[in-house]
From Swiss-Prot:
Protein species of origin: Beauveria bassiana (strain ARSEF 2860)
Function: Might have a role in sequestration of chitin oligosaccharides (breakdown products of fungal cell walls that are released during invasion and act as triggers of host immunity) to dampen host defense.
Protein name: Secreted LysM effector Blys8
Free-text note regarding domains: The LysM (lysin motif) domains are small globular domains involved in binding chitin in eukaryotes. Blys8 contains 3 LysM domains.
Family: Belongs to the secreted LysM effector family.
Gene responsible for this protein: Blys8
Upper classification of the organism: Eukaryota, Fungi, Dikarya, Ascomycota, Pezizomycotina
Domain LysM: 42-89, 146-193, 233-279
Pfam family membership, one: LysM
């Protein structure tokens, strides 16, 4: 009868507990954890099935809803679980944290105050730095002075590239739990990104002989990876920002934002916080067509166009110089000017002239022998005149203007 009773008791327990809960708790989270999870957590369970609810966790591990929500504040009062995330189901190995009790007794002749402090040792926070955030992984260097909160999609390489002040090897050295191949990097945890002596700004990658960026724009650092090279307007991405909110704040379309910052991905999962994103690009050439030969006097027109295109400018006999902007993406800053006898770049062709970005260029004949210009990015070595493959029209003796 005893054997039979034990059998029935075991069957009753098995019927009461869902088979999905008959598995050991994990001392380390297998999935991402939400921000704010208790730093004293000693066991975790994972929401590995869509049907898994808070009630399942509470009944499986015999914990109260109040305790569960205090250990996992991100679930909220309605206790919503995220599929695949790990949740804390025990703190301090089931022991209470530090408590202090004070008792006071008195008589008619004297007062005696007795203070009794009862303390149960709690495990140290997962951060090995006394003032560091939590949670962190084991083994983090003791002298860490800067931290980064890892989100889904981050890698060791991405983090080191984002900061630009340390190598991936250094990041792994400071955070050894991630492993040599970075497979142990956990979203929802803090990692060390600086120790005493780590630079506070990234090392410049400019060439030793260059004092000016190739496009004339000084780019702030760090930036989103693979950001377009012709960017001249930037915005700093704050933690919690999304692509749509950043684009809206900058007054640009989401499609343009994703095009200028391609590593963000269509779902914006690759957007880096604490880095600059591009919210505006510069044209290949921008210039003002001016009345006098020294770029003074009235402005006849303002022109700009993008790489890979040319532009015909009708001068109406009112242009003697071009004031070319310092910013632009023409290769090496080379601007080609083609002179045409008639408007709309027609009639006789009188050859080429060249200018550079950031230059005031006095035009051939100071504008008297042509009525239009065709402007594009090109170097002198590539033109047909230099290669003897074309012939210019005879230069007129008289002005056409």
């Amino acid at each position: 009868m005893r054997t039979l009773a034990i059998f029935f008791i075991g069957a009753a327990v098995a019927a009461h507990v869902s088979p999905s809960h008959l598995r050991p708790r994990d001392p380390k989270p297998k999935g991402p954890v939400d921000p704010g999870i208790s730093p004293y957590c000693t066991y975790y369970d994972e929401a590995y099935d869509k049907s898994y609810t808070c009630d399942d966790l509470l009944s499986a591990w015999v914990i109260s809803k109040q305790d569960f929500e205090s250990w996992n504040p991100a679930v909220g009062s309605d206790c919503k679980l995220v599929l695949g995330h790990s949740y804390c189901v025990e703190v301090n190995h089931g022991n209470p944290l530090s408590t202090t009790t004070t008792t006071t007794t008195s008589t008619t002749t004297k007062t005696t105050t007795k203070t009794t402090t009862t303390t149960t040792a709690a495990p140290k926070p997962t951060s090995s730095a006394p003032s560091g955030p939590s949670p962190t992984q084991d083994g983090l260097v003791h002298d860490c002075k800067a931290y980064y909160f890892v989100k889904a999609g981050d890698t060791c390489d991405k983090i080191s590239q984002m900061y630009g002040t340390f190598s991936t090897a250094q990041f792994i050295e400071w955070n050894p739990a991630v492993g040599s191949s970075c497979t142990g990097l956990w979203a929802g945890y803090y990692y060390c990104v600086g120790v005493p002596g780590t630079p506070t700004s990234r090392t410049s990658t400019a060439g030793p002989t260059s004092t000016k960026p190739a496009n004339g724009v000084t780019t702030p650092q760090p930036t989103q990876p693979n950001m377009v090279q012709d960017c001249d307007q930037f915005v700093y991405v704050q933690p919690g920002d999304q692509c749509g909110t950043v684009a809206s704040r900058a007054g640009v379309s989401l499609s343009d934002f994703l095009q200028w910052n391609p590593s963000t991905g269509k779902d914006c999962s690759g957007l880096w916080a604490n880095a600059y994103a591009c919210v505006g690009v510069i044209p290949a050439i921008a210039l003002s067509a001016r009345y006098h030969a020294d770029c003074t006097g009235a402005t006849h027109s303002t022109e700009h166009f993008n790489p890979g295109t040319g532009h015909c400018v009708n001068t109406a006999c009112q242009v003697a110089s071009l004031d070319i902007a310092a910013k632009g993406t023409c290769p090496d800053g080379n601007v080609r000017i083609s002179y045409w006898e008639q408007p709309d770049c027609t009639g006789s062709w009188f050859g080429y002239g060249y200018a550079s970005r950031g230059q005031c260029r006095t035009l051939w004949s100071e504008g008297w022998k042509f009525k239009s210009l065709y402007i594009t990015c090109a170097s002198k070595e590539s033109d047909c005149v230099s290669q003897n493959s074309c012939t210019i029209s005879p230069i007129p003796n008289n002005n056409v203007c």
